[in-house]
A protein has these predicted regions:
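Tandem CBS (Cystathionine beta-synthase) repeat/Bateman regulatory domains
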Residues: 1-154
Length: 154
């Protein structure tokens, strides 16, 4: 299940060209995994790319979940307890199936609020069913560091 973020109307404010948007700070080249790939491949890819999670898609390219270090830690503990090898299990057995997303035209403040409200580390950035990128907590901090002056505008 994919949950797309649309901020409440009462909290929306008029957007100007000078506002700092998610699309300006998201990572555009997103590493994704197919839901049928092995958990071992996921562990290796996350480790080698120094990332903590990634979107999971089905064979049609539709977002169906997110796999994270936390999901993998649960798998490692279960596999040790039951003495089961890790390489034969697919991503779909361990991924988080309820995915919270955000749209590219939301501000970094909308994203920061959403990170705090939902306690997530990353959000796929979506336009309809298409993954445009991914934004993380560290991307929000990067954006905040680049803001000049006290008015929170570029």
């Amino acid at each position: 299940m994919v949950i797309n973020y649309i901020s409440p109307k009462k909290k929306e404010h008029k957007k100007t060209n000078s506002q700092i948007l998610v699309k300006d700070y998201m990572t555009k080249n997103v590493i994704t995994f197919f839901n049928y790939e092995s958990i071992y491949l996921v562990m290796s890819t996350l480790h080698n790319n120094k990332i903590s999670g990634a979107p999971v898609i089905n064979k049609f390219g539709k977002l169906v979940g997110v796999i994270s270090e936390t999901d993998i830690m649960k798998h490692i503990l279960e596999s040790r307890y039951f003495n089961m090898p890790t390489s034969k299990n697919s991503v779909s057995n361990f991924m988080t199936k309820t995915v919270d997303t955000i749209t590219p035209n939301k501000t970094i403040f909308d994203a920061a609020s959403r990170f705090l409200d939902l306690n997530r580390k990353r959000f796929p950035v979506m336009s309809g069913d298409k993954i445009l990128g991914i934004i993380s907590r560290s991307d929000i901090i990067t954006a905040a560091l680049k803001i000049k002056g006290q008015n929170w505008r570029k």
